[in-house]
Amino acid sequence: EKLRQIEASNMVLEKEPVDLLELAQAVKTAFEPELAKKKLTCMVTGESAIISGDQKRLHHVIFNLVSNAVKYSTESGQILIDIHNLGKNVQLTVKDQGIGIPKEDIPLIFERFYRTDRSRNRKTGGAGIGLTIVKAIVLAHGGNISVESVKGCGSCFTVVLPKN
């Protein structure tokens, strides 16, 4: 249902001042039990960065990116969430040391229901729509999202959002 609303471009943003650094810290706190279970370290670095955005939807973006980082990280790995002001924009990166994404799959990961390895469905769960929703929310805010990854060496998702 959520995906249908987003695809129909019915996303109404309830904009207010949102500090992405505070939001990232709140998401990290929500993941503490899972981080401890997998012996993962998660650090939030950077600076306070306030944008005009929909707090609930931006929380969803960070939550989904961190969820994927936790899900695909190997035990004792590290996850880094970094927030920086870049002129009229804010850059958010979520970097992990997980299993990475094969090069040929990178152009497809934001597609609806796409899974890089269907054999993982049972083990890691998920319907393959998380990144599709994340991308739609980022685009609705006038931003963009990209990923750099090397299979076996982790992934780095970068979101750039306008401050206004």
Task: Tell what function each PLM region has.
Residues 142-143:
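Conserved glycine-rich
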Residues 101-115:
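Short conserved segment of the HATPase_c
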Residues 69-70:
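Short helix-loop "hinge" at the ATP-lid/N-box region of the Bergerat-fold HATPase_c
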Residues 14-29:
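A conserved beta-strand-to-alpha-helix junction within the catalytic ATP-binding
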Residues 9, 34-44:
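Short conserved segments within the C-terminal catalytic ATPase subdomain
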Residues 8-13, 46, 50-53:
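Conserved micro-motifs of the catalytic ATP-binding
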Residues 76-88:
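Short beta-strand/loop element within the Bergerat-fold HATPase_c
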